[in-house]
Amino acid sequence: MCGIICYTGKKKVIPILMDGLKRLEYRGYDSAGLAVVENGKTFMVKSKGKVSSLEAKLSDLSSEATFGIAHTRWATHGKPSEINAHPQFGCNNKVSVVHNGIIENYLEIKEELIEKGHEFTSDTDTEVIAHLIEQNFNGDLETAVLKSIEKLDGAFGIAAIHSDVDHKIVVVKRGSPIIIGIGENEYFAASDSTALAPYTNQMIYLSDDEMAVLNSTDYYIKNLSNEILKKKVEFVDSDMYTNDKKGFEHFMLKEIFEQPETIENAFRGRIIESEGVSKLGGLEPVIDRLKNMKKLIIISCGTSYYSGLIGRYIFEELTELNVETEVASEFRYRKLKLDKNVAVLAISQSGETADTLAALKEAKRKGALLLGIVNGVGTSIPQLTDAGVYNHAGPEIGVASTKIYTSQLVILTLIALLIGRYQGMSFTEGKEIINAIKKLPDQIREILSNAKMIKEIALKYSVYNDFLYIGRLFNFPTAMEGALKLKEISYIHAEGYAAGEMKHGPISLIDENFPTVAIATDDLVLEKILSNMEEIKARDGKILAITNEGEKKVKNIADDIIAVPRTLPLLQPILNVIPLQLFAYYIADEKGCDIDKPRNLAKSVTVE
């Protein structure tokens, strides 16, 4: 949700912190701030709004400070305001804290501190941490932080500095990501490796209940029992974390156009064409358990939930597994029977989604096999799961997911193919699926070559305030994902429905001012969705159809069509969603919306 960046070393700190905030802004952008220490005095600057607002306030500030902390916020406790922005500080302005997460018992701690004479200025839970550290400080920041977090309930990533303790930064992780960057006589901490990539390729991913202590000459990591730990240093490909639009107007448009490459990255080195099977090294440690599993539960949130819904159809088509897909935030509260014969597959772009992590921990307690599909290497979900597969799609900066979604669908297909071949799928069927997967990048390029035509259609429909999206089978979740994209970035009301459910309510809304986007590609339910389209036309509803080239019946009913290439029905959603992404993008652009940073949303949802 929020973004944290910290630095201690010999370079001027403010340019480094500001660069880091810009790279982290997609995690939250309703306020921002920084605190630096120079000559034993803390200088703090905060601003409501985006990082550019903070940058404007810093334009006249001249500072030689070489250590500090900074934060970009997505509000959970307290409205977006300068007072509620981080860093937060104690009564004497010596302790400064940035925090990502939620402190569940902050009100009772706040009452205790008020009784001891502390005065609070903000509505945030974070300010409680600063006052608590101040209360416990006796010359040793490290000890004060350790003593303070003993009282905290909830999930958090915390960074703290004290103006009396030169060049020392103390960071703690519990349920919210903290990554340490190792430079030459300089050290960094951040909530995302994207912020560190320009400065170092050596990173350490903290696990829960670990603390890192950084200064300008060295660092060490310990657990909360005060024991020093030896952590593996990961060497990260910094090129994977480039934060460049590459000539596109928005990151989202760039990421839409990157999908031929990210699809290739998803299957490159992971298929054995001569055997009609996939090869997923990340699953090899558990393959004997996996191929004998009877039940698979897919858990995820948002766009990843819709990829999971399509994944259910794919697994049912290719394997003998009994498959369920659950919203992660609901999963942990249900009385589901979980044991060693059940696999739970978590899908998350960031690898840090709080609800998904909480659901995984519940499944782990009950003995299930834990699997993951994530894009964020070294993040919390891969650390928690027994095995998994990375997207290797590079950073997705636009808040509305595009390239990760289609990459997830390819990986789900590869996992289902792997299990299916163990369970009786023929070589011929496996080879057919592999051949179809290999064609996807060029088929996506073909769709993208028609972006100008899709833009013209989008502009035509940009005058409407409500949309219905309908689909069946594999394309029911595609309809929901298409509607979500439009809602997220254009703020237009849109609903995705199973087409067969239309007559059970949504059809009452249809008139000439309520258009429908119908996903009507060639599969066994095409005739059914054609009937639904006829019902819409009978009520003067306008229809934009996503269909295959040459589908005359669709063309005869729809007002407008966007044609996509044919592929296997289980892969067709990958192609069908591309024009839906572009359609949403061009409408939002026409409306002048902030496409990469839509209001009230954050890229990485690290609070429940």
Spans of model-derived segments:
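Acidic/histidine-rich
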Residues: L152-E186, S462-E488, D523, L530
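Conserved short alpha-helical segments that host acidic/polar catalytic motifs at enzyme active sites
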Residues: M1-E249, E264-K294, Y333, R445-N450, ...
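Active-site phosphate/pyrophosphate-binding segments
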Residues: Q259-I263, F267-I297, A387-P515, A588-E608
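Glycine-rich phosphate-binding loops that contact phosphosugars or nucleotide phosphates
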Residues: K291-K439, I519-D560, F583, K591
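Generic C-terminus detector
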Residues: M252, K542, K555-I557, T567-E608
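Glycine-rich oxoanion-binding loops at beta->alpha junctions
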Residues: T66, A70-I83, E273-I287, G311-I347, ...
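Structural motif
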Residues: F67, V95, K295-I297, A343, ...
